[in-house]
Curated annotation (Swiss-Prot):
The gene is murG. One of its GO terms (biological process) is regulation of cell shape. CDD domains: GT28_MurG (cd03785). This is UDP-N-acetylglucosamine--N-acetylmuramyl-(pentapeptide) pyrophosphoryl-undecaprenol N-acetylglucosamine transferase. Its main location: membrane. It is found in: Cell membrane. Belongs to the glycosyltransferase 28 family. MurG subfamily.
Amino acid sequence: MRIIVSGGGTGGHIYPALALVESLLKHEPDSKVLYIGSFRGLEGSIVPKTGLDFKQLHVQGFSRSLSLTNFKTVNLFIKAVKKSKHIIHDFKPDIVLGTGGYVSGAVLYAAQRLRIPTVINEQNSIAGVTNKFLSRGADRIAISFPHAANQFPKDKVVLTGNPRGQQVFEKKGDFSLTEFDLDPKLPTVLIFGGSGGALKLNSAVVNFANRFSEQKKFQAIFVTGRKYFDSVSNQLADLKINSSNFVVLPYLDNMDDVLPKIDLLISRSGATTLAEITALGIPSILIPSPNVTANHQEKNARQLEERGAAEVILESDLSSAMLYHDLSELLSHKSKLESMAQAAKKLGHPDAADKLYKLLVQVINERKQETTK
């Protein structure tokens, strides 16, 4: 297969794309893959490390208010579409996959104009503006939440799940919590506010750190985010927190290794995180970010809450006392954790990347049949 993959801006668009590529190369090792990203997004630092062929476009998002920058945005989009057409013409893909972000809008729109088969992967329960715009010309839309189905043309929608779920589900390794000087036998909570950290969550955790460190029934890995690490460390030092059951880190580079070893996750509710924890069956306390388009993180989180897989605390309601009460209640009641874990697993798609790969093959074959009629 010759495929162009495009998705950018955040890890939530990039990692599902890379998970699909991993599945593709497992099934068809001789496939040719070209990844097209933007100059502004994280893909510029992530994708080249994978060894994939990588090209970049100049794009930017629209301002939600009337602004002269939107004229520049339109101009950049037109230029990006034109450049995408040249790239597509030279690469000659069998299909183009978009996983979200403004850059995928330009690439998929160009592919559709050139009558190249296109598939959209929508990771959230609330569809992004770019994916809604592209759905009319797409061959299929692969969704991760059933709730997203009614936002696209019905005959094009396929529930595959988020490819990232399979990648973390299949991760093999001999990692142990002893690497953090923790006891593998104790119930463990991972507190993670995302790659950038979450200020209010960090404050809540710091405020209950003393109580947490005094009990010895369970343990925590607290990931602050790099920009908050020094501040949090200083606050904990002032409180004289230095406990063997409370590990503080700026970031986790080996999240795939750590997730299977924990009993509870406290985190934001981005699509990639939810794909990971449902594939693995991890109970969670979710604190949706209020700073996202269309409040999609809360919508994502409610999908798990409704099925008994997670508890949801809105950031506006978050307090140190509430969070400590909820996590200690869950970690103290194994039967409740097991029930939530089973509910999470039922929502998971541990074969999502393979499902998406098969969908791509199906679309390519359908287009071939159409051209031979």
